Amino acid sequence: LHSKASNKPGGWFTKLIGCPESFTEPKDIYKKLKERGMDYITITDHDTISGVLEIAHYPEVFISAEYTVFVPEEKTSIHVLVYGIDEHIHEDLMKLRDNVYEFVCYLKRKGIAHSLAHPLYAVNGGRVSLSLVERFVLLFDNWEGINGSRGERLVELEAKIAKAFSGWEKIAQLEEKYKMCALRERPEIAWTAGTDDHSGLYVGKTWTKANAKSKEEFLKEIKEGRTQVGTDKLGYERLLNTVGVCGYKFLVTKNKIPSQIETLCECMFKENNSLIGDFYLKSLFGLNCSGDSLFKEVLNRLPSITLQKLRNSFTPDALGLALIGLAAHFIPIVILSAQRRDEVQAKMIAKSLGINSNREFRLAYITDTYFDINGVARSSQTVRKVAERFNLPIDVIVVESCSVAINGEEKKLKVLHPILEFSTPYYQEFKLRIPSVISIAELLKDYTAVHVATPGPFGLLAFLVAKLFYLPVTTAFHTDIPSYAYLYTGSEDLKEFLYKALSLYHNLSEAVFVPSQTYARTLIERGVKPEKIRIFKRGIDTELFNPNKRERNYFQRTFGFTPRGRVVLYVGRVSKEKNLDVFVEVAKHFPGETFIIVGDGPYRAEVERNSPENVVFLGYLSGETLAKVYANSDIFFFPSETETYGFVVLEAMASGLPVLVSKKGGASEHIKDGVNGFLAEDLKEYIAKLSALLLDEELRKTFAKNSLSYVLSLDLEKTYLEYLNMLMGGQKSEIITSFFRFKREDAGYEASIIPSKGRELLSFNEMLQDAK
């Protein structure tokens, strides 16, 4: 617990600007502690007792301090809380701080109560190692079990680590290891607790209890380890609010705070907000919350408010305010990152001691596109459905505006709302949405691993936050963005820059999931490390897409036209990268056949303008209607050269269509040329191979049969479970907890997955071997 006497900066930034650690008056601390029912009171300022001396005349106050003490072998400093001292002892202790052994020996010799402060939290950017913790075990009988500015996770880890060293036998082993005598008086570590408050907001909200009728008895109980500890709710909001209060008071002392911001801070940091203050916050930020979350919610809304002002009036003042708002918005993330770093260090120590410190596995599946109509969105939707059906520890997290209606409560789906939304250059229909970074952090702090499916604004921000939180992150390459950029801009430099950026991005991940060998080779050629690459396949819904949906006169009854000749179908986005100019040119060579385009996009007007009359546009279709269009066509023609996988090719094959596909891109990997389809690479070859298909009905039937057999081997649930197994297995977690039952059916190889009882749980690969 700190007062204004802790007047030195605590970190590199506060040192840079000269901001002290606390501005709280000792008498205010005393008053609050009495109001909150504390029987005995002290203040533990850093390396000084000047603060507590201001209230030392009260009978329930005892003098204490938090000393920064050096550990020579570890070349690091630690903090030691010392209770019930006087000015002479303080002078002695200040002289002994350069050597922890001399410091603790003095305390033991004098019989002074003391406790090791925040054992698993590094001081001044140092590192807490296993050897340092083992020296703690040899030196200190009391540890600070709860530190009010740290999270609950660190409290749990500290208790587990301390328990691992219980007993004189363990202490003797460490004496032998470090060739030194322990200064311990008890075989078990006892606990103290403190708020570590620097702001005055949390005074008395974390405490140490003991059965005592005087402060002398209380100090004796601490010394002999007969204490209990307690706290109000912990959370990073405590430290965040402390930073806010200290920053605000520092600016006030420097007369550098605008009156509007001063009013805002007064409303936020008063413990009992007035009705006027509540109205002010609600009108300015739309806030109804109070307490610990208030400052966080203000920071959460700052970017959207300041950016809106900037859009309304682009002035230097508005720009400055927007930049300040964005910078302030990242304060909670910096604090959470620091706390997570301490947790990771503690977990490493626990692991080295054989302590299971892992949280229950939870994967956040991040995607910029979910409600849109594209392959990546459909894949994300299937991930959610499979995760729900098999109760996998996976949530799909998306960003969407309030205007999108979600049918019912979709399990395994979390939706963030954007603070900024804009159309993609060259593709106005596709929106890029940016949520607040705080909302991302609030979600990801509860997960143990992250998969970023898309490198859009949301995906990149989630990637950054996950890295700052020391979470394992995997990525995916679903879309050839550099090639798209080149097709639209003609800039080779932009294409090269984007490939370099993507290579850096993927190399920073644990693994990159690529849907085809073609693009795996491309990424490796562009600089992605080969050991990062994971190939994954996905099936499609063969109940929805199948040949049995062919109907007589379907196009006449549904769309009001009768195709002439045979139907050659394209399904997909109508955009430049899909190479639809080739589709149109081929159609011109077959005026007696009908060429249908299903889909929409930014290139539609251009394609329609250049199309002959035998090309028909049906727009966006989905579900049963799309499935019937597939089944009632005769040939599927897909000239796109930038497909990373080609879902629509699989849908066509499942619908019993022979397919003609570009040799370039990932979609070609589904085709064995001349067996279940044709591959082509230029206009002449497309025309020749399409002509062969149109003229030879038996060839079409053979291709269709072989296509269907191939697609049925890519069972939807089986392939997605295998994919999700890789995602989760990459994090060394418990993974699929259902069992597979395989059966052969006339239509091909089908997998069905059922829960099972009474058997050992297996991973997908183990289950597959077991079934074989």
PLM region descriptions:
Residues P658-V661:
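Short hydrophobic beta-strand element within catalytic cores of glycosyltransferases
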Residues L1-P20, E87-T208:
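Domain-core and long-helix interface of multi-subunit machines
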